[in-house]
């Protein structure tokens, strides 16, 4: 059972994650830059590796999407590190949905939570 601090952190990090998944928010370079750590790295569902600049640069070319997140779970690693895991379903236009298992490692720096690492693994 999670204590009140863990529940609040789960809500905070889940909200940020869901905002990042929202295609309208994704296109806000300022928001993404503020959420991702300068040394951010992602292993995408495509198998490609991205850094923060790649994510910000790709925003303008990203098609409109609808992505849902479910089964969110938080593991507190330390007072300044937490791992959020969940399942996502992404629909692009009328195309088939892409489902993935996702993990986001966030760290607290200067009192603010920033995503340091993210991995998406396609669900077959």
Question: Where in the sequence are the language-model features?
Answer:
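A beta-strand edge to alpha-helix "cap/lid" segment located at domain peripheries
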Residues: 2-34, 39-124
């Amino acid at each position: 059972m999670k204590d009140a601090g863990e529940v609040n952190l789960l809500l905070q990090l889940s909200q940020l994650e869901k905002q990042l998944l929202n295609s309208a928010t994704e296109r806000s370079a300022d928001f993404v830059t503020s959420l991702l750590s300068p040394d951010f790295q992602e292993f995408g569902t495509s198998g490609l590796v991205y850094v923060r600049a790649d994510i910000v640069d790709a925003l303008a070319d990203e098609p409109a999407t609808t992505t849902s997140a479910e089964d969110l779970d938080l593991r507190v690693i330390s007072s300044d590190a937490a791992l959020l895991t969940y399942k996502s379903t992404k629909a692009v236009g009328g195309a088939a949905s892409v489902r993935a298992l996702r993990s986001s490692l966030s760290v607290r720096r200067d009192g603010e939570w920033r995503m340091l690492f993210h991995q998406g693994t396609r669900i077959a």
